[in-house]
Amino acid sequence: MSKLRFRVVETAFKKKAATVETPAERPSEYFAKYVFNREKMFKYLPGAVYAKLTDAMDNGAPLERAIADEVAAGMKRWATELGVTHYTHWFQPLTEGTAEKHDAFVEHDGKGGMMEEFSGKLLVQQEPDASSFPNGGIRNTFEARGYSAWDPSSPVFVVDDTLCIPTVFIAYTGESLDYKTPLLKALSAVGKAAVDVCRYFNPEVKKVMAYLGWEQEYFLVDEGLYAARPDLLLTGRTLMGHEASKNQQLEDHYFGAIPTRVAAFMKDLEIQALELLSLIHISEPTRHSLIS
């Protein structure tokens, strides 16, 4: 055990950077490639359906079942062109991470064959088991289920062969079992209060959108070194060991050269950020070794 860290460090220095293939297209061409944004909605949905969906996204207007069926059909047509075979209601439970259950688009046709189908009913709501989430232990068996409901204000996106549908997740009793439900409630309350204030200066203000400022730094740790640190594994924080070198004493200063493995990671992150995270304005325009 006393030599574990030395062996891990030695192994880390021998690792080579991952090979990252740059897309043949320009960044502007694969921007939001795997996101069902408004441009793709306009292309794959009828005009009236597009208007109804954007109204639901912008103003929280309810969607009729027939409109949901049309939206689901358009989403499926776009997704299958990307090679998608499954869909999932994707949410962030109170137990951290993400939760998802992948279902295929296939249905029996009643004649011994199969057909690909994705209806508005499957898009809008599902009833997964909520037993493994903080849902209370004293309850009847039928109360173990939860409800996942599509949130039109967040973009649907594709990862690998799966269409990911952002949803909220609540218990049978209506209690929130995810992080998004309270966030949406908070945004609604902040927006309403902000509109009231803005109308003192401009009576025509109808809506105020709140944005979250993301932290700009991230830390990269070799997987082997990470596994050898119980404090990082259990808490995600450094709780033991020597203090880091300060005052730019080494060559890894504020404008230091970016290590090869780190540069490969940044390149891969840039590509995925443009393809997937572009609609929520997460991009990586700068490569910078921030050591301070």
Regions found by a protein language model. Give the residues of each.
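ATP/Mg2+-dependent ligation/transfer catalytic cores
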Residues: 144-270, 277
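Generic recognition of long tandem-repeat/solenoid scaffolds
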Residues: 163-165, 289-292
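Aromatic/hydrophobic pocket-lining residues that form π-stacking "cages" and hydrophobic walls in ligand
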Residues: 52, 75, 194, 269, ...
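Short, surface-exposed recognition loops or helix-turn segments adjacent to catalytic cores
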Residues: 67-68, 211, 283
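Histidine/acidic residue-rich metal-binding segments in metalloenzymes
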Residues: 15-120, 124-140
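Short aromatic/hydrophobic-glycine micro-motifs
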Residues: 61, 84, 203, 278-279
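Residue-level detector of conserved catalytic or cofactor/ligand-binding positions
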Residues: 280-291
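N-terminal hydrophobic targeting/anchoring segments and the immediately downstream early-domain regions
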Residues: 2-24, 141-162
